[in-house]
Amino acid sequence: MPVQAAQWTEFLSCPICYNEFDENVHKPISLGCSHTVCKTCLNKLHRKACPFDQTAINTDIDVLPVNFALLQLVGAQVPDHQSIKLSNLGENKHYEVAKKCVEDLALYLKPLSGGKGVASLNQSALSRPMQRKLVTLVNCQLVEEEGRVRAMRAARSLGERTVTELILQHQNPQQLSANLWAAVRARGCQFLGPAMQEEALKLVLLALEDGSALSRKVLVLFVVQRLEPRFPQASKTSIGHVVQLLYRASCFKVTKRDEDSSLMQLKEEFRSYEALRREHDAQIVHIAMEAGLRISPEQWSSLLYGDLAHKSHMQSIIDKLQSPESFAKSVQELTIVLQRTGDPANLNRLRPHLELLANIDPNPDAVSPTWEQLENAMVAVKTVVHGLVDFIQNYSRKGHETPQPQPNSKYKTSMCRDLRQQGGCPRGTNCTFAHSQEELEKYRLRNKKINATVRTFPLLNKVGVNNTVTTTAGNVISVIGSTETTGKIVPSTNGISNAENSVSQLISRSTDSTLRALETVKKVGKVGANGQNAAGPSADSVTENKIGSPPKTPVSNVAATSAGPSNVGTELNSVPQKSSPFLTRVPVYPPHSENIQYFQDPRTQIPFEVPQYPQTGYYPPPPTVPAGVAPCVPRFVRSNNVPESSLPPASMPYADHYSTFSPRDRMNSSPYQPPPPQPYGPVPPVPSGMYAPVYDSRRIWRPPMYQRDDIIRSNSLPPMDVMHSSVYQTSLRERYNSLDGYYSVACQPPSEPRTTVPLPREPCGHLKTSCEEQIRRKPDQWAQYHTQKAPLVSSTLPVATQSPTPPSPLFSVDFRADFSESVSGTKFEEDHLSHYSPWSCGTIGSCINAIDSEPKDVIANSNAVLMDLDSGDVKRRVHLFETQRRTKEEDPIIPFSDGPIISKWGAISRSSRTGYHTTDPVQATASQGSATKPISVSDYVPYVNAVDSRWSSYGNEATSSAHYVERDRFIVTDLSGHRKHSSTGDLLSLELQQAKSNSLLLQREANALAMQQKWNSLDEGRHLTLNLLSKEIELRNGELQSDYTEDATDTKPDRDIELELSALDTDEPDGQSEPIEEILDIQLGISSQNDQLLNGMAVENGHPVQQHQKEPPKQKKQSLGEDHVILEEQKTILPVTSCFSQPLPVSISNASCLPITTSVSAGNLILKTHVMSEDKNDFLKPVANGKMVNS
């Protein structure tokens, strides 16, 4: 019980003799001043006046009636007829009615009669303020005039409180508290919480209780400095708002000073904590009343003190702040509330009685009421109190339950200072601080559990959470999905895949990171595992495409569009964002956080393998994880100098690092028939711990035909599509993680017409991968090339790798395991991974039909790069990147975000710096066939990637060229003196018709593949030279075809691929008198040292490095380690599919970069270089059937 409770519950006993009232000796007699004394003590008074307030007793003591309202509370019998007789019969009648009403109301105090001074409020239907007001009414003496005046005021007070109680019954306490603090803040004040507010007020009192005058700034700084150890959130702003609250309550005496801040001195009446706190609380209550808020004393006590022990304190404040007009306003307010709720309890019947009570004058000096007015008032108050009790018992939603204090994250999370310093706490069990170590730990643990709870959250576009996620330390279960956008929603069993899947789980170090992971997956899509994959176009992607969702990728350990069966897989579906006018690029996985445990180096051999798949064909099954062996999660090791923040980690196991495909990829928009069934069945996973390959929906993956000692690599390049940087923005090694398997594909909108004539052996039912994502990524990088590109002839010849016939060549290009260690730590920008072309001639061709009738910028077949820098038609290229450019213009650059920063004047830092160096060769190997036969580059014209200019034209970005130098550097001899240039502007072109000769192509492919066994044994220097050998063989083939000159130039642009292979030279444009054999010997260095470079001419991205001095061929040799990048003047390598008018100068940063040796089969791809003369009028003659024509 509150301390002050006994002051008003002792009305059942005599305040003089302290004896409980009874019906015999200690009969209660009420005086006109509302004090009730037993008759024995009253007879002992020396003078007829109240012993407490000395109010004169006008009526004879023997005439004063016994207060039977109080007697019935102590169990006495109330007589039916009392002996009191008033002056006239009319007054007696009104008196009896009024007395009866009071006695009836007193019955609501019956639970208080359990014993002397003992009150049990729990069984009462009335609130404590109502009980206190009712006790005041019961103690009124109706016989005396003053008593009747007091009774009228008590009746009015009861009626007013009844209205307030009824309004409170219709309010939402949570909404009420929010409105209260909003009103407080609107007045420049602030309440910091019960504990912190108390400490702040005590510190203000400590600073000013001695009468000192301080400026507001000094006072605030003092309080903040003292609060910071216990409340780190204390700030000058918040404490300033507390001081403003006291200032508004007129607690300070302000002294103004000229040209200086005013001094504040605490008024004398507020130099104690109780007085200061009461004025503080009264100011908050006053603000609430100004805002029209009705808050019960219980709520006030909970809000301001964090307990329920200050209800009486708050009620007294409320009562003092009540105005005579507030009653009438409350009645109107109640009427409005009842109209809104429909008034199920018919409370409108109380309105006349409430209005009668509101009209009573609350002034103590008011005129005495008549007996009729007294009767009417007593009847009215009895009616409204009965109505309130009836509503609480029958219609109240919350009943008469004490409101529980709202949970506070700081509740009992620190030790009580009073207990520590003084050995005891005056608040006792109501203290909001812990009083023992056990209590402290208990509430801290409870807060942690509350914070760890995952609540369901609404997703965009009606996406809901199907299951509540319980976060554990072992896994993250993502069950986020949308039945609207995805056909199926499957909960994951171990965070990523099925229970039988042995792929490691995503380990969360804390619940916070788990929540962030779930939040990120919520925004992006769903990760589920139900053993299903999207095979070809699915209804899911069609549905999602309708609502404009981001590209979505079937993520699986096998080929996503594999026609064969697949049992285990995961699917990542992006959640659509309807508000976005374009395809949004958001991190698929959680952002970089130190709370998330990532994976180790994927290059290292790990002791477990990915789950086993149904084996069909001749591929051996991968080993499985033994039972009981915990799966190990590899961690991706980044280069030492790469900023950690710039490389958001891939936070899923390596088998799930797939690119996301546009839903266009899987729609039935392809003009071709569906692909034939896969002859090999499901693809076994990569057992080495590296990334499993990403597959586009138009091809079937075939694993490599060879096996290395250290690792089995798949045919993969970094995916071109919409993989975000935070998914796969790791070191250079990880970006080009063994350039096999990942490959880039250009994309064509499904609606564009196609003019391709597929080969008979190549059923092109390939679904096109959308390139809108990577298109929108680099508008500015392409911008500088648009102005110089001529319209190119599109090659739409489909690839042969989708064919069910296996003889299609398989070229696997791989980097050594220590590739990333040899590179420097320059930050790798995100979009590089999405534009790299495959170097496998067997797989690249599937991309050739991506952009219909569009210029093909480059041919990158079998590790050789032919660069297109010289086309001038802007319009032909513009719409390819229109979406990207529009998106970038709308998307402002955020300097320190994880997204790329790209200047509107061009891609300055999007590519890797020249610091990435490697000495490792790029080895192309294949095993098929036994004979060796030179193959013209025309044989591989169909295998062209529409976005392979990533390997080419971007080389003329001075700051990003080394990105390609490290792959595409070739040592070639300056062919300028050994070739004759065409005097016309005709370009070399190749008819597409000759490429349709399937038997010839297959035979040449088989012969090319036969070179693997022979060339694998060559050392690193031989790889360089053999690469050039293949190029020279093509020169020789071109020379033999000199008779074919003009036929290919007449073909339609959509039907042929123009092969532009030019050796550019600015010094000797007219000398090709030396034999090709001599040039070949010079280039290959066969006549001399094998470990020396030949002509000293390094081709950067296929560009020959400028020779600054002319020496005999044998004097031009330089070692591999001395290869430096020299600025080129106007040297390019012209692509097969390019039709151009002028070269684009390439500026390569000066850095020491060792070339990557590419071992290519003879004739696989012939790299021809041509140095443009100053007048830019020398071009090569057309080529027929891969043979070069020399004029």
Swiss-Prot record:
Keywords: Cytoplasm, Metal-binding, Phosphoprotein, Repressor, RNA-binding, Transferase, Ubl conjugation pathway, Zinc, Zinc-finger. InterPro entries: ROQ_II, Roquin_1_2-like_ROQ, Roquin_domain, Znf_CCCH, Znf_CCCH_sf, Znf_RING, Znf_RING/FYVE/PHD, Znf_RING_CS. Residues 530-546, 554-576 have a biased composition (Polar residues). This is Roquin-2. It is found in: Cytoplasm, P-body. Residues 91-170 are annotated as: HEPN-N. The gene is RC3H2. Residues 326-396 are annotated as: HEPN-C. Zn(2+) 1 binds at C14, C17, C38. One of its GO terms (molecular function) is double-stranded RNA binding. Post-transcriptional repressor of mRNAs containing a conserved stem loop motif, called constitutive decay element (CDE), which is often located in the 3'-UTR, as in HMGXB3, ICOS, IER3, NFKBID, NFKBIZ, PPP1R10, TNF and in many more mRNAs. Binds to CDE and promotes mRNA deadenylation and degradation. This process does not involve miRNAs. In follicular helper T (Tfh) cells, represses of ICOS and TNFRSF4 expression, thus preventing spontaneous Tfh cell differentiation, germinal center B-cell differentiation in the absence of immunization and autoimmunity. Disulfide bonds: none annotated. Residues 528-576, 644-680 are annotated as: Disordered. Pathway: Protein modification; protein ubiquitination. Interacts with EDC4. Interacts with CCR4-NOT deadenylase complex. Interacts with MAP3K5; the interaction is probably stimulus-dependent. One of its GO terms (biological process) is post-embryonic development. It is an enzyme of class 2 (transferase). SMART domains: RING, ZnF_C3H1. The modification Phosphoserine is found at S549, S808, S983, S1119. Proteolytically cleaved after Arg-509 and Arg-585 by MALT1 in activated CD4(+) T cells; cleavage at Arg-509 and Arg-585 is critical for promoting RC3H1 degradation in response to T-cell receptor (TCR) stimulation, and hence is necessary for prolonging the stability of a set of mRNAs controlling Th17 cell differentiation. A zinc finger (RING-type) spans 14-54. The record marks R509, R585 as: Cleavage. One of its GO terms (cellular component) is intracellular membrane-bounded organelle. Its main location: cytoplasm. The RING-type zinc finger is required for proper localization to stress granules, but not to P-bodies.
